[in-house]
């Protein structure tokens, strides 16, 4: 039985990709549990407000509110939340915006399991380091 330490909300406007992403996250064995999924940025924001996850993984292009707008809104209200962007676009303007918003990782679709594992591993290590620092 896996021990979950970190909560995740995943946002992706393509249901099949969203389902695959959730499976990949939970199969890493790194302690991340998906506590909410959304097909739009506005749905994702509502879930974040309700559940305050440790990590938000979002597609960059979604209806109603795109991933960058979502991250900016979440960052303003929940500054401790970490972010991973998934995108089918390697456009440098998107990457610049992600850097400006202090996104932890930018993964190109289709998201490969080893790339997701590496990204989650780095984020988990950041969480652990912060926890150790906080606990002294």
Regions found by a protein language model. Give the residues of each.
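A generic structural motif
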Residues: 29-34
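Conserved Asp/Asn-Gly motif in the active-site loop of CheY-like receiver
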Residues: 35-42
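CheY-like receiver
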Residues: 45-135
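Short hydrophobic helical patches associated with two-component signaling proteins
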Residues: 20-25, 116
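Short, Lys/Arg-enriched, disordered terminal segments
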Residues: 1-8, 27-28, 50
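Conserved sequence signature across two-component system core domains
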Residues: 11-12, 38, 56
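Conserved acidic segment of CheY-like receiver
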Residues: 5-17, 21-22
């Amino acid at each position: 039985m896996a021990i979950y330490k970190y909560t995740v909300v995943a946002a992706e406007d393509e249901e099949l990709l969203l389902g695959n992403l959730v499976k990949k996250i939970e199969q890493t064995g790194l302690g991340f549990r998906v506590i909410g999924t959304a097909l739009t940025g506005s749905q994702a924001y509502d879930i974040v407000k309700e559940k305050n996850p440790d990590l938000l993984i979002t597609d960059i292009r979604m209806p109603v509110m795109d991933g960058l707008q979502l991250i900016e809104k979440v960052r303003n209200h929940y500054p401790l939340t970490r972010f991973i962007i998934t995108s089918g676009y390697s456009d440098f303007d998107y990457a610049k915006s992600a850097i400006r918003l202090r996104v932890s990782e930018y993964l190109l679709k289709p998201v490969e399991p080893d790339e997701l594992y590496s990204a989650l591993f780095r984020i988990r290590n950041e969480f652990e380091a912060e926890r150790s620092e906080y606990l002294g």
